[in-house]
Amino acid sequence: MTVDAVRVELGARAYEVRIGPGLIARAGAEIAPLLRRPKLAILTDETVAGLHLAPFQAALAEAGIASSALALPAGEATKGWEQFSRAVEWLLEEKVERRDVVVALGGGVIGDLAGFAAAVLRRGVRFVQVPTTLLAQVDSSVGGKTGINTAQGKNLVGAFHQPSLVLADIGVLESLPARDFLAGYGEVVKYGLLGDADFFEWLEGAAPRLASDPEARQRAVRRSVEMKAEIVARDETEEGDRALLNLGHTFCHALEKATGYSDRLLHGEGVAIGCALAFELSQHMGLCPQEAPSRLRAHLRAMGMKVDLRDIPGDLPDAEGLLRLMAQDKKVVDGKLRFILARDIGAAFVAKDVPGDLVRRILQEALATR
């Protein structure tokens, strides 16, 4: 299999997302052209370090690149002030200079945290994303959104800081637990829902074999990255079209906050549930065909994914409580929520005039099934 390269066109800050097998094994050769001196600082987590850090550092050494690494605890709870401060202090202790490169080796949590650390360190150093989860490969590693969570909500502190290179090794996805792979699929299916009905139709047939079929997996990752790259090139800082990438995320972020960013609900699982709720809301507003939400839910169920609020273990707030959590969403403008709704599968749009009473009713009905 060959490596695909998708270019994110951002003028002088353009970069490539390289997608294919074996990229970690030749990471040194891939990254070396970016370096002013043969030295790298790697931020990773303890789980990824046990699986991929040794081969990654061996590939760097083969290219004559020295490296040091800090492994943070795995999990969403790491994406906060404490571990962020620890990472920044470590990078300073390692004497990372402004012309050096930081590597984010891991999933979305590490990519977001390491990217933000690179953004603020010495007022900005370059970084390379080496995403090791499906979710990170198709979404969080591309586009330059970096940041951490706070007590007030998810991703409320951060910066736009584009990577210099993304290496998406699809081979490492074979080591992912099934639940994590399916959670990542929540972001893959989102791309079909928001802007490519043909891709969604292909996924309905191909998705069950993504975990075992490298060619299908690479195609799914490539198409997802292509769609994100096109949108980011048009709207880097989310003033318009880029908000489409948040399909399902208004509901998702509230649910993640309600579950304490714990393993009760992984981010991609929340995205899948959020997409289902967004399509249901669209249908209730008379915007999309009645069969669209049913078709989406049927596909998610066939994949063995979480689909409804009843699939989330443990207690949840009532509808009013969830609405209050939504009010902290980054997409709030002038105190009003913006939702990403859909006219059909593959036809999402930004809506600024969604009736709060209808959102409340959708949530009440979903909670009533628990």
From Swiss-Prot:
Its main location: cytoplasm. This is 3-dehydroquinate synthase. NAD(+) binds at residues 108-112, 132-133, 145, 154. Belongs to the sugar phosphate cyclases superfamily. Dehydroquinate synthase family. Its EC number is 4.2.3.4. Zn(2+) binds at residues 187, 249, 267. Binds 1 divalent metal cation per subunit. Can use either Co(2+) or Zn(2+). Catalyzes the conversion of 3-deoxy-D-arabino-heptulosonate 7-phosphate (DAHP) to dehydroquinate (DHQ). It comes from the Bacteria. GO terms for cellular component: cytoplasm. It comes from Cereibacter sphaeroides (strain ATCC 17025 / ATH 2.4.3). Pathway: Metabolic intermediate biosynthesis; chorismate biosynthesis; chorismate from D-erythrose 4-phosphate and phosphoenolpyruvate: step 2/7. GO terms for molecular function: 3-dehydroquinate synthase activity; metal ion binding; nucleotide binding. Keywords: Amino-acid biosynthesis, Aromatic amino acid biosynthesis, Cobalt, Cytoplasm, Lyase, Metal-binding, NAD, Nucleotide-binding, Zinc. It catalyses: 7-phospho-2-dehydro-3-deoxy-D-arabino-heptonate = 3-dehydroquinate + phosphate. Gene3D superfamilies: 3.40.50.1970, Dehydroquinate synthase-like - alpha domain.
